[in-house]
Amino acid sequence: MKNYELIETRRIDELSTDACIYRHTKSGARIFTMKNTDDNKVFSIAFRTPAEDSTGVAHITEHSVLCGSAKFPLKDPFVELAKGSLNTFLNAMTYPDKTVYPVASRNEKDFEHLMDVYLDAVFHPNCVEDPRILQQEGWHYEMMDEQDALRYNGVVYNEMKGVFSNPESVLERYIMNALFPDTCYANESGGDPAVIPELSFDQFRAFHARYYHPSNAYIILYGDMDMEKKLAWLDEAYLSEFDAIDPDSDIPLQPAFTELHEEEIAYSVGAHESLTKNTYLAWNVVVDALDNKRNLALDILDYVLLSSPGAPLKQALVEAGIGDDIFGGFEDGIRQPYFSVCAKGADAKDKKRFLSIIDTTLRKLVKEGLDQQAILAAINHDEFQYREADYGRSPKGLVYALTAMDTWLYGREPWEYLFCTQCYQELREDAKHGYFEKLIAECLLDNPHAALVICKPERGLTEKREQALEKKLATMKNGMTQAERIACIDQTKALKAYQEEPTSDENLRKLPLLSISDIGKQAERYHWEEKRVEDTLLLETSRDTRGVMYLRLNFNTQCLTEEELPYAGFLKTVLAYMDTKQHSFQDLSSDVLLHTGGMNFDMNAYPDLDHYNHYTGIFSVEVKLLYEHLDRVLALIREILHTTKFEDTKRMAEILAEARSRERMKIEGAGHSYAVNRASACFSGTGRYQDLVGGISYYHFINRIADAFHADPTTLGRKLWEIADKLFRFENMFVSITAEPQGIAAFEQIYPTWKENYRRDLREKELLREVLDADYIAGTHTAAAEEKPQLILHGSRNEGFRTPSQVNYVARAGWYDPTKHPYTGALRVLKMILNYDYLWLNLRVKGGAYGCMAGFGRSGEGYLCSYRDPHLQETLACYEALPAYIRSFSASERDMTKYIIGAISELDTPRTNANVAALSVSAFLSHVSNEALQRERDQVLATTVEDIRALSDYVEAVLATGAGCTIGSGTEIDAHQDLFLTTEELFK
């Protein structure tokens, strides 16, 4: 091919892909193409960007290059693409040693537009000429007048304040620092908030000039496209203008340690949190993963040693009382992968015992051998995931591209980790001959390149750091001359003016845009059929699943009281993690993964669109399996639902402690979701339900039962037994299946026998109930047939939950009453306008929040929220001003086309088989018809400016509900007590 040197080609049969590696002769760019029939095309360009300090220059550059370029001189082309393209993926990511810019689309014209915008962004960005972009995306001094305090602000600055407020993120940062002190991994590529303000504009420009060059680029094309045509365009449009250079971006190996290193750090906890049993102990060791087989084997060891229920290393630490949550595992994707064992909820004084137990346990496993069933189960699970290639909302081509970078960046072939089938076959055989035990000895035991990181709690550390920063900035302000203060004020105002100034229409039109005619008019339909077998409703969706069945047993929770629902929420955590009548929980886990691609238990509330303010609560058993394992899997489901030994108080204590830890970690990682859910619980039955089984109320519940368990360890198990007995009955159940016709037929054939066996289980439980408690015979299980009252809602209120965080998650939620304001597809267009114009401009661009979002449901729920937000009062004021903005909304025809295309892009997200299985249940329970889907799409396509203005009443109603929740900085919440009905410490 002209101007390219073909380095090597391979056929990857597992992926039905023809792969080629090229080098662009003039610029030195590396190109990897993966040609196949997947219409969800992916383009990615990555640069090796080793961090030389912790100013976050790589991360800030990632943000900044997407703020306009020579060919597309808009202020925010990324946002314009987000709201005006049919992308199936659009983002950019900073890693410890690379920065990646991937896009994906199923539309050929759209895909070419996305490639063009991203390539111009990385090679010709405006940010290297305009310091205001660095100020906005990275950091700047902020002072509006002489009386104003001097502050730091910036999107990345605030994002990383949020990251550094999370103890697990802090721990990960210092693990890398401890293991690789002489390499780029010792620095924080995302940026340390204490160091980010040291980044100058000259350093920023120099970083881009050095690393953002084709000679340092790794370009990937994946999918159904004319590769020769794409490469010719790449050459002509961009690569040919560059001459090859040496970017000097090689990442050296860290010289191996000769002895264990130790590092001690602190993390912030609330004023009332305990300092005992609140330390993280982390043992970490650098491992060599020199080929794919070894890489997969280390990942499997992660599961066998740490992640599986009853994993021996995890169990040994828990039983020794060192930590109540053990996690870690194999971390790759960097030059030198490492293996970690982390104990959360430990004491620093136990560090020697922690190391001793790890060493003793591993040596015992090497000597006596690992559980072969556990190894085979882990291999089976990994291979199932690999073959299924279902990565949720991420296109599989993106996952393959990122996997290719795990080797390509370090001088190895990009397809090395994509060939897995033979490796799995070899590992099954090797497991019989001590391969994994030898790996433990070589990589984990006989390896001095290790570090112990101790992360200790410190009360009020966040507040101390905030006060120190305020003092530093006050001193800085006091040391300024009058001219310097005026210059700072002028710069702040100039930046605000720049942020508020809209991009000219002339520049907006330089960005390529599809037309409405490029969009399909037909909504994607649901195709389930309802059938009754043995008087059980089956919801059957027939489609090509490549021999995989997606099976869901759905149990209506109407039989449970409000007091019982949180117990059901905990039940989904317990099932398959305790002994049953036939299996230990360790053997049960292996049996499940030997015969399935995973079994999950979940709870969700589905609004009834035929009866507003009503919903259906469902406890679901979700499993994916190959058809030939159906009989065994159904037997396992019966066993788990009916013979779990809830009376095992020792095991229950372990699960409870881990659940308490994991729920806190979830809140720390996704505070915006919890804030929205909590606010919705004030007025919405579905919101209240989700709060009880997985929100802040559930977190409080877990803490209560954990505290009570020590004094009364038997009641919890009995309560779960009663909940399971009431819930898992035929009168509560319907089944949904997504599979090919032969898979559905196989289920229908086996179901009558399974149901009879299930009935026998229930009869046995009836006898057991008589033995356990004669008073319980009255038959609470028949409550499914009764009409239960809706959940008690607590009415509108604004709550503040203080955490040891430097940023906030600020949510408002409410109801617009669909009987007065009928749901319309125009609300999807309004969502795009708010997410990428109004909220984006006010909360992210001007306010410095990392994220902002809005949403409107078919049943009348609406919400607004911010993510890693330095503000609180200003954000709430922004929400309150929204109805006026919508009433006076104006947009050109081109702008409306963009909003409509963005809304359609969300509707047309490719559906995996697992997505289809979940959506079928949701649509069935909520009564969403194909006609409603088509009507919604028609309304989206026909949305006008007038339609948007008419939605101001909807938003006004949402805000008038008065429900709000803020999770975050105690300093901010305490400073604005008047905004809240109640405030409290979330973590106590």
Segments from the language model and where they lie:
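Non-catalytic terminal extensions that flank enzyme cores
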Residues: 1-42, 258
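Non-catalytic, conformational "gating/processing" segments within enzyme and secreted inhibitor domains
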Residues: 153, 205-237, 717-751, 960
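Hydrophobic, small-residue-rich alpha-helical packing segments that form membrane-like cores
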Residues: 143-216, 220-238, 242-270, 275-277, ...
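His/Glu-based metal-binding/catalytic segments typifying zinc-dependent metallopeptidases
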Residues: 35-37, 44-46, 157, 161, ...
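Extended, regular secondary-structure scaffolds
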Residues: 206, 218, 227-246, 368, ...
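Active-site His/Glu-centered metal-binding helix of metallohydrolases
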Residues: 57, 61-65, 571
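Aromatic-residue-lined binding/catalytic grooves and analogous aromatic/hydrophobic interfacial grooves
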Residues: 439, 443, 702-717, 721-727, ...
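M16 family metallopeptidases and their MPP-like homologs
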Residues: 40-50, 76-124, 131-142, 169-194, ...
